[in-house]
Amino acid sequence: MEVLVTGGDTDLGRTMAEGFRNDGHKVTLVGARRGDLEVAAKELDVDAVVCDTTDPTSLTEARGLFPRHLDTIVNVPAPSWDAGDPRAYSVSDTANAWRNALDATVLSVVLTVQSVGDHLRSGGSIVSVVAENPPAGGAESAIKAALSNWIAGQAAVFGTRGITINTVACGRSVQTGYEGLSRTPAPVAAEIARLALFLTTPAARHITGQTLHVSHGALAHFG
């Protein structure tokens, strides 16, 4: 299986790539930070393409470097700063936080899917792995809700080609690539990768347009 993994310059993206590689698949890593990306690609012995997935120009220029035929796209958006309670920040800070969250979380996924979605073979899959945020959160919570709704809508679009598209939302306490990286237990990150991998298998053919949560039930506090 040919797999494209974005966010390859983050620990979470690297973990996703490692999970697919260990399962015997051919992986291409994508990331904006050349140094971190090249280190990850060398350690995993996979191909790498330097590209900022929030930038249409960068994606257009890199398009010819991506595999011509893909079975799976794994989107790992970069972390974004959430201003939280707007009363504690200036209007400018809040605006920047929302724009940053939109670019990092939604546009990076939307633009990547638009750029290479036609490279997917029939029966392929798209999985986006993002941080889980509580309903009462700030910019990140609202933006990730927007992404989930977009994913749900795209299920109908890609379903005509037998392609599934889903989101894995992982709690901050159990993910890598966002915060407390060195303190996050590696087996937990690997569990997230295994869920992403499962969503690309024939056993998950009827799961599409969904957001699956891996958070030790954290959202139960907001139910």
Curated annotation (Swiss-Prot):
One of its GO terms (cellular component) is plasma membrane. NADP(+) binds at residues 4-28. One of its GO terms (molecular function) is oxidoreductase activity, acting on the CH-OH group of donors, NAD or NADP as acceptor. GO terms for biological process: fatty acid elongation. Keywords: Oxidoreductase. It comes from the Bacteria. Its EC number is 1.-.-.-. Substrate binds at residue 128. It is an enzyme of class 1 (oxidoreductase). PANTHER family: 3-OXOACYL-[ACYL-CARRIER-PROTEIN] REDUCTASE, CHLOROPLASTIC (PTHR42760:SF40), SHORT-CHAIN DEHYDROGENASES/REDUCTASES FAMILY MEMBER (PTHR42760). Was identified as a high-confidence drug target. Belongs to the short-chain dehydrogenases/reductases (SDR) family. This is Putative oxidoreductase Rv1856c.
